[in-house]
A protein has these predicted regions:
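Small-residue (G/A/S/T)-rich helix-start motifs and N-terminal tracts that mark the onset
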Residues: 1-76, 80-105, 110-174
Length: 174
């Protein structure tokens, strides 16, 4: 809501509902069974934080990639799932969708970035603009590479460096 979203619907496992309602009482909530219906309702889909890395999470992510062409923001475990061996095929589908015009925004911290690019964390820290650009090019979208400084990279090679902030900005929930 602080970013201007008019209405937010959280699709999550039922056991997460109570704690989430305490933190975000104004949001709507639905179960994983309502994912397809909710994707039709949404203007933008964000996936990743709190999704986990189990098989159920991968199936949920597959549904988001395969059943929708809405703009997609991916963070946290959604990125980790793409980097894992059983997520490679899904990553390829997402790259194809990006090439076909789907809006894709990936928001990795350097650990997630290193896994997605199969590089070391020190390499990604040292070459954050280049790694951000590589990720943006790979998925034909936008990469928001988070570290002590955040770099927003576009597929075309343009990037914006946010010189404010600190390493805490790459911390979960910031």
């Amino acid at each position: 809501y602080r970013t201007g979203a008019g209405m937010v619907k959280v699709i999550t496992a039922e056991e997460n509902r109570q704690i989430l309602q305490q933190g975000i009482p104004e949001a709507l909530y639905g179960s994983c069974r309502q994912l397809s219906e909710s994707m039709e309702w949404a203007d933008v889909i964000a996936v990743g934080p709190g999704i986990g890395r189990e098989e159920q999470a991968l199936e949920c992510l597959k549904k988001v990639v395969e059943k929708s062409r809405k703009p997609l923001v991916m963070d946290a475990d959604a990125l980790n799932l793409l980097a894992e061996e059983n997520g490679k095929e899904l990553a390829e589908k997402l790259r194809t969708q990006g090439a076909e015009g789907r809006i894709i925004i990936l928001t990795p911290h350097v650990g997630e970035l290193s896994r997605l690019l199969a590089k070391t964390i020190p390499e990604c820290k040292k070459e954050l603009p280049e790694c951000g650009r590589e990720l943006a090019e790979r998925f034909h979208g936008v990469a928001v590479a988070k570290d002590a400084r955040t770099i927003v990279c576009k597929e075309q090679g343009e990037f914006y460096l946010n010189t404010t902030g600190n390493s805490g900005m790459a911390t979960a929930g910031s």
